[in-house]
Amino acid sequence: NSALWPVAGEAEVPFISCSASEFVELYVGMGASRVRDLFARAKKEAPSIIFIDEIDAVAKSRDGRFRIVSNDEREQTLNQLLTEMDGFDSNSAVIVLGATNRADVLDPALRRPGRFDRVVMVETPDRVGRQAILNVHVSKKELPLGDDVDLASIASMTTGFTGADLANLVNEAALLAGRQNKVVVEKIDFIHAVERSIAGIEKKTAKLQGSEKAVVARHEAGHAVVGTAVSKLLAGQPRVEKLSILPRSGRALGFTYTPS
């Protein structure tokens, strides 16, 4: 949903944001009242945009697996939301945006024509996008980087990371550098931060012993051999960058890292 925030600046109209969880209260009727107030404000300030974050908090399906108990506060709130959206005509100057990571549980009535007409899937950023996001957070924090830091390389190591993950990665790298009293954040700090995000924190007090270490070493070596063979046989496939048999807080006894 962070992808929607730039809309506030680009649209140059009032941007009214809220979280759907704010509508749900102990007292029945409060949620519906807040929805009415929200839409009344948007109409008064039209042209305007309403942004409802985590809309699944009040808009779960009323049928089947995700059924809402009848007369529940959430159902009244959802009904009011549907009523307000039906009240818009084609010339309405109010646009409603909703964000959720659980589109599968939303009530079908929410997706009917005249309500939420369009669905936009926001995927995790690609390598170019990740590099741009890293640049933003490094610049925003005025982070002093070492000469060996190449954000394009860091972006290649972070496949599948969201914008929030990348922001946390920059913070983690800065913390790791700070703990060692460094005056700049070096590439190794980013690498360790990536490893922590992917595999967890090293358990330095829980090292593998004897046959267990041998089994894990063979297992990870097998991953590395296959990964290396694939990278040589198929053009464009990444090579194995690192192996580890240090236990991690994520219950992994080791890992083989291959960036995309």
Curated annotation (Swiss-Prot):
One of its GO terms (cellular component) is chloroplast thylakoid membrane. Zn(2+) binds at residues 219, 223. Its EC number is 3.4.24.-. This is ATP-dependent zinc metalloprotease FTSH, chloroplastic. Pfam families: AAA, AAA_lid_3, Peptidase_M41. GO terms for molecular function: ATP binding; ATP hydrolysis activity; ATP-dependent peptidase activity; metal ion binding; metalloendopeptidase activity. It comes from Helianthus annuus (Common sunflower). In the N-terminal section; belongs to the AAA ATPase family. In the C-terminal section; belongs to the peptidase M41 family. Binds 1 zinc ion per subunit. One of its GO terms (biological process) is proteolysis. It is found in: Plastid, Chloroplast thylakoid membrane. InterPro entries: AAA_lid_3, ATPase_AAA_core, ATPase_AAA_CS, P-loop_NTPase, Peptidase_M41, Peptidase_M41-like. The lineage of its organism: Eukaryota, Viridiplantae, Streptophyta, Embryophyta, Tracheophyta. The gene is FTSH.
